[in-house]
């Protein structure tokens, strides 16, 4: 959202109590959104309705109350969803007939961060016109509607049940998990109630970890960013597999029956292969610049079209829409199954993997036998007084990059990525031989380091 004063591409996020992540600003934000929605409704006589969901971090109580007060003061009704995965809020916004949805979450970040993300009535990112109107409304003083036009707030008590039924509807009616022992790591986050309940209803024996949030333990040593915890529990309990979500439930990673971690690249391979066999796969599978070269090679062997987008689930989504595809994802566990959900949904994605395993009569480990990952490593080269763009475009760096790409041609990849958030250039090399990979990485990163000095 270039040129915006307050918002980035995915709402706002930061340290609680600093900048826009404050109760004062969020109160004004709720009021501004309420006024925009009231104006959009015009004279039809119905108050706009906004649903609010959150993850489990302690500051969510403060921001939920602030948003509620601001919206109600502007004349909008509010339905409080309580702790709810981000994709669930998108689904509920789309299906409850409301005007907008809000998620209070900082995803996989620590508890001391938080953020605000918006959904349109269609459960998608707000359009440019609404975003611009919201920015403009924030520069207008707080407004309280006349008493008879004030909004009301209520709890959406059927929200959990509706979302669970949606998740169940994403798998065949006859599918169940009877006889399956699985470990669920909910990151002490937004999936802590829904995920164990859902998988038990499907018949699984569920061993739960990371399902006791206290407001400050979200993502702390648990969840998809700490997969070793899940792996150890799988080995300890002799489970068939483990599933780990992140704090807001839009990412999923797994561990096989031996406790080996299974990342988003692995899960993408399992789904693509299964969906091709089922005739469900359409268009290209979309990965990112960071997807392992072994995945690309495996897809080529299977004659599955594969394209790469920039890093970030929104770019994966964009590439899928443009290419008419239905399956994409990144190693971090953001998976998009667009024939089942409009956004990345950790629970729905996990269910699709379990269906693929059941249909193929395979364990997680067996389903990965056709995939040979190659060694991959990234080095961050910190910049001096030279910009990232100038560093990457330097003749010496371009020559070193061309030489690196030639040395791993047909065996891997070498590429550079200027960071968008810090003064570094990321140097990545992968190859089917670890020594070749390391030597190539050393030469290329040295050239970048010299140009950046």
Swiss-Prot record:
Gene Ontology biological process terms, A to Z: carbohydrate metabolic process; peptidoglycan biosynthetic process; UDP-N-acetylglucosamine biosynthetic process
PTM (free text): Activated by phosphorylation.
Catalytic activity reported: alpha-D-glucosamine 1-phosphate = D-glucosamine 6-phosphate
Modified residues (Phosphoserine): 107
One example GO MF annotation: magnesium ion binding
Cofactor(s) this protein cannot do without: Mg(2+)
EC number, as in UniProt: 5.4.2.10
Swiss-Prot/TrEMBL keywords: Isomerase, Magnesium, Metal-binding, Phosphoprotein
Record PROSITE patterns: PGM_PMM
Keyword Isomerase (UniProt): yes
Similarity comment: Belongs to the phosphohexose mutase family.
Family annotation (HAMAP family): GlmM_B
Protein's name in the database: Phosphoglucosamine mutase
Lineage, opening ranks: Bacteria, Pseudomonadati, Pseudomonadota, Gammaproteobacteria, Lysobacterales
The gene coding this protein: glmM
